[in-house]
């Protein structure tokens, strides 16, 4: 909204333009001898007005003055046309001269017009006779002029309606009718109707398609309107029902009823009530959400990541529950359409659900929904802030407290603590070793025997909820060369997958490993062995961890009975672990590493262990980034403990001698 507006007074000679201005600022009447008054500014503090107001007096006499008046008409925020109620010709001059002049000078840039009949103190029978024609002409103006036209009568001598004149000028600028309402057709504009429908959905907290008494009063309170009693609401409902039968149902006002109530406010005018409602929901003068609301400023320092805060997670959880129409714990396609109806569009491509936890029908679970928004926040928090606004979130800090700023892994290492709630893991491996299955198993997807190679230009990625308030991103990378710059800036952990039956697949990840070391990327590394069912000697697959991860589905559907020897399968019926000299030699010379087994035929604790690797690396900056034990930490602890014990022994002997 503007801090100040410019109002210009025009009209025939001797109608009292200057007298109106003088009486208003001096609060008394006096005869004015000069033809025009200098510009007057009325501060906002005066009478608690909406804003400061500049009032321009005009006089149509001579070429220079006329040019000056025309310039003021072009730039005025509101135009007051004054006529004298005791001279009907000055009123007719509005139709014949002043309205055409305004249309000529303003073109499509219309401004609100206030038609003012001055000298009301001189009203006589003749004026009353002309009043019907005046009212009909005013109605004609309103139907032909595409902006607000208001009409009132006043007296500069008795001060009658002078404050109303200023108020009408200000409200016509700040609450423009044409943006919301077509008076000629008695209907809302499309933009107004669209905005009010969105507000209706935001206030419909239980998403039942109607506004209850509680929800109506939530709307009233948020907009600064007076709350209503049950009796008042029932009276309005009865009135709405008498006009539109489907405007009210057993639960309250329907969307049609809500729109009809606002149409009545617009019909009565001015539009202040509806504008106040719209601005309370952060709409600007063009019925677009405020830029500062949709795109608030969040300063994210270098080497930091973003994720939803606890407040942000709670908001999206409540959003999920609101739009879960049948309370079955998932969002159907119908639910998603309803959810995003308050936004311009769904911000992701079709099929985005496959990257997150869903039910068997690909409907997002709550875990999947929260993972989706945490991943979005991690990759581009600005989109999250934008959609928080579309979903109606509004906090004291303009939604930026919905986002948490986290240290990068490098900063965690420096501070010797693990602070992040999200870990980004890159998964490398040769073709057909089971990378996609490794990702899909994490988010509970069913195993498929069909092999579909991942497109090298579209690396597959999933995100899931691993532990309390912890999220893991798994990004499948296809290619023999590591993306050094990307890994350096984004990667927290590298997973190297190989088929235990294929030396060639191990050579592939050994090459990746060597590149990581050559580039001196200080990133933890985990080796993962696939297609091996003999895990008896591997303590990493302890079934006691079955209950630790709600995202991991037990896909042990008699899969071991499927004697499909297709190499595209990520399991094998061979009970013996296929090893080779190349693989054995590597792990003998790299004792910090011990391969972990992955199998879809059992619940895996491997994803938890990957997170533990990250946590340990934050406390133990090992350049090898191994998934081995913290022997150095233990040794340090033992040395310190022995030292303390020795000091204690010497001290006790000393005291004994004393």
UniProtKB/Swiss-Prot annotation:
Belongs to the mitochondrial Rho GTPase family. InterPro entries: EF-hand-dom_pair (IPR011992), EF_Hand_1_Ca_BS (IPR018247), EF_hand_assoc_1 (IPR013566), EF_hand_assoc_2 (IPR013567), EF_hand_dom (IPR002048), Miro (IPR021181), MIRO_dom (IPR020860), P-loop_NTPase (IPR027417). It is a single-pass type IV membrane protein. Residues 532-575 are annotated as: Disordered. GO terms for molecular function: calcium ion binding; GTP binding; GTPase activity; protein kinase binding. It is an enzyme of class 3 (hydrolase). It is found in: Mitochondrion outer membrane. Its main location: mitochondrion. Residues 1-633 are cytoplasmic. SUPFAM superfamilies: EF-hand, P-loop containing nucleoside triphosphate hydrolases. Ca(2+) 2 binds at residues 324, 326, 328, 335. It comes from Dictyostelium discoideum (Social amoeba). Mitochondrial GTPase involved in mitochondrial trafficking. Probably involved in control of anterograde transport of mitochondria and their subcellular distribution. Ca(2+) 1 binds at residues 204, 206, 208, 210, 215. Its EC number is 3.6.5.-. The chain crosses the membrane at residues 634-656. This is Probable mitochondrial Rho GTPase gemA. Residues 657-658 are mitochondrial intermembrane. One of its GO terms (cellular component) is ERMES complex. Keywords: Calcium, GTP-binding, Hydrolase, Membrane, Metal-binding, Mitochondrion, Mitochondrion outer membrane, Nucleotide-binding, Repeat, Transmembrane, Transmembrane helix. NCBIfam families: small_GTP. Residues 191-226, 311-346 form the EF-hand domain. PANTHER family: RHO FAMILY GTPASE.
């Amino acid at each position: 909204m503007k801090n100040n507006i410019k109002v210009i007074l025009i009209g025939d000679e001797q109608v009292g333009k200057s007298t109106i201005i003088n009486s208003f600022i001096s609060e008394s009447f006096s005869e004015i001898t000069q033809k025009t008054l200098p510009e007057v500014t009325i501060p906002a503090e005066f009478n608690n007005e909406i804003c400061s107001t500049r009032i321009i007096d005009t006089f149509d006499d001579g070429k220079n003055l006329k040019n000056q008046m025309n310039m003021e008409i072009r730039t005025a925020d509101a135009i007051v046309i004054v006529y004298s109620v005791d001279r009907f010709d000055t009123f007719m001059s509005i139709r014949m001269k002043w309205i055409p002049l305004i249309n000529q000078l303003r073109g499509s840039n219309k401004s609100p017009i206030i038609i003012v009949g001055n000298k009301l103190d001189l009203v006589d029978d003749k004026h009353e006779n002309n009043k019907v024609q005046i009212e009909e002409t005013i109605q004609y103006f309103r139907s032909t002029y595409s902006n607000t036209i208001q009409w009132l009568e006043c007296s500069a001598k008795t001060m009658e309606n002078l404050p109303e004149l200023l108020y009408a000028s200000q409200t016509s600028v700040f609450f423009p009718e044409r943006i919301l309402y077509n008076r000629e057709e008695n209907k809302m504009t499309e933009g107004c109707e669209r905005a009010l429908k969105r507000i209706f959905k935001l206030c419909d907290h239980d998403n039942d398609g109607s506004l209850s008494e509680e929800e109506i009063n939530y709307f009233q309170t948020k907009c600064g309107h007076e709350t209503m009693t049950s009796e008042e609401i029932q009276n309005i409902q009865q009135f709405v029902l008498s006009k539109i039968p489907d405007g009210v149902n057993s639960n309250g006002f329907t969307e049609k009823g809500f729109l009809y109530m606002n149409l009545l406010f617009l019909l009565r005018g001015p539009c202040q009530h509806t504008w106040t409602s719209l601005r309370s929901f952060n709409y600007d003068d063009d019925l677009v959400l405020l830029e500062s609301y949709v795109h608030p400023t969040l300063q994210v320092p270098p080497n930091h990541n973003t994720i939803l805060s606890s407040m942000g997670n709670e908001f999206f959880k409540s959003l999920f529950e609101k739009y879960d129409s049948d309370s079955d714990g998932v969002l159907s396609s119908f639910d998603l359409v309803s959810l995003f109806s308050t936004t311009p569009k769904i911000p992701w491509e079709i099929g985005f659900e496959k990257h997150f936890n869903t039910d068997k029908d690909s409907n997002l679970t709550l875990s999947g929904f929260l993972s989706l928004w945490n991943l979005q926040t991690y990759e581009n928090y600005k989109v999250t802030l934008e959609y928080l606004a579309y979903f109606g979130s509004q906090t004291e800090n303009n939604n930026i407290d919905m986002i948490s700023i986290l240290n990068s892994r490098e900063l965690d290492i420096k501070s010797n603590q693990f602070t992040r709630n999200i870990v980004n893991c890159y998964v490398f491996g040769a073709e057909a070793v089971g990378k996609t299955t490794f990702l899909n198993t994490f988010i509970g997807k069913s195993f498929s025997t069909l092999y579909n190679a991942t497109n090298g230009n579209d690396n597959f990625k999933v995100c899931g909820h691993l532990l309390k308030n912890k999220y893991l991103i798994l990004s499948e990378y296809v290619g023999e060369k590591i993306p050094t710059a990307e890994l350096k800036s984004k990667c927290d952990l590298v997973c190297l997958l190989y088929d235990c039956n294929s030396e060639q697949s191990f050579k592939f990840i050994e090459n990746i490993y060597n590149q990581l070391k050559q580039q001196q990327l200080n990133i933890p590394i985990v080796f993962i062995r696939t297609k091996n069912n003999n895990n008896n000697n591997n303590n990493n697959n302890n079934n006691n961890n079955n209950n630790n991860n709600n995202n991991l589905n037990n896909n042990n559907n008699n899969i071991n009975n499927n004697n499909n020897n297709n190499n595209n399968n990520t399991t094998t019926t061979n009970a013996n672990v296929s090893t080779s000299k190349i693989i054995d030699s590597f792990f003998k010379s790299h004792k910090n590493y011990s391969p972990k087994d992955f199998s879809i035929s059992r619940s895996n604790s491997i994803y938890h262990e990957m997170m533990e690797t990250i946590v340990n690396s934050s406390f133990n900056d090992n350049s090898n980034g191994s998934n081995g034990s913290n022997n150095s930490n233990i040794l340090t602890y033992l040395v310190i403990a022995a030292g303390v014990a020795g000091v204690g022994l010497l001290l006790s002997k000393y005291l004994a001698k004393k």
